[in-house]
Amino acid sequence: MRAIRKNIAWIMLIMLFAVGCSSIEKAESLYRQGEKQEALEMAISLLDDDSPKVRLRAVKLVGSIGGPQAGPALHERIVETDGRVLREVVRNLGKVKYEPAIEDLADMATESNSDMLRALADAFREYGKPAIDVIVSRYDSSNQSGIRAAYKDLLIAVGPEIADSISKLLKGRSFFENRDTFDILRQIKNPRVATLMMPYLADEEVAEQVVEAMRNLGSNAIEATINALQKQKKSGDLLVSERLIRILGLLKAKQGIEMLESYSQHDSERIRNAVEQSLFQIRGF
């Protein structure tokens, strides 16, 4: 009798799974046929299906369809117990750019494993600046080393898209106070960081910190600096040109020698002196 009950239970589970699979397949078919609203409603109804595989497909479908209903429906699934499904919920909240979920996603950063960290990074990258500003603020305001480290790891995982938001932290602080911020920029190891930070060389409040940040970026800052110096020949902002010249010297960038030499006969003595100093740093004589 006990064996019969067990078999019945298994049969019911299989039937439920089959029903769920059939429903999600129908929803996906409707979506392919262009019946987006009907497909969305069916997918939303399957977000709490008993099968994690069905829930996973439902989350992906809701994210693909998008629209006003998608964000709130996905946000409700932030309590998902299956790790893989939850990561997909996180990614798709970013995909549909549902802003009311940003703070909840930021909360998750402090208790994330490496897989969830990547999912959160994908989401914040999709959201863009409004969400990145939130994690930059959390990183900057935290007094607890563990929490601060968690947000630091998330910022690094997000990548060069953080450059604009994090550059604002450099203002009014010493090199020592900004050491963690410089470390974030260095660890991203992407030339785009340098390109995105270039406009801040014209900001007197933060320019010297940006010069230091470029030094920390190392070889990842060389090409962007050379390109910026080339453009400066037309704009003629002497202070920005001088800073770019200094950066090439600090980086000991041999690739920049030709560009520096093109500035060696500049009308400004200040520029000529900066070129001489940078060439000395690069060549050693």
Which residues are covered by each model-predicted region?
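Acidic, Ser/Thr- and Gly/Pro-rich intrinsically disordered linkers and low-complexity segments
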Residues: 229-240
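Bacterial N-terminal signal peptides that target proteins for export
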Residues: 1-11
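Structural detector for internal amphipathic alpha-helices that build alpha-solenoid repeat scaffolds
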Residues: 23-35, 45, 53-67, 72-76, ...
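C-terminal motif of bacterial Sec signal peptides marking the signal peptidase cleavage site
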Residues: 18-20
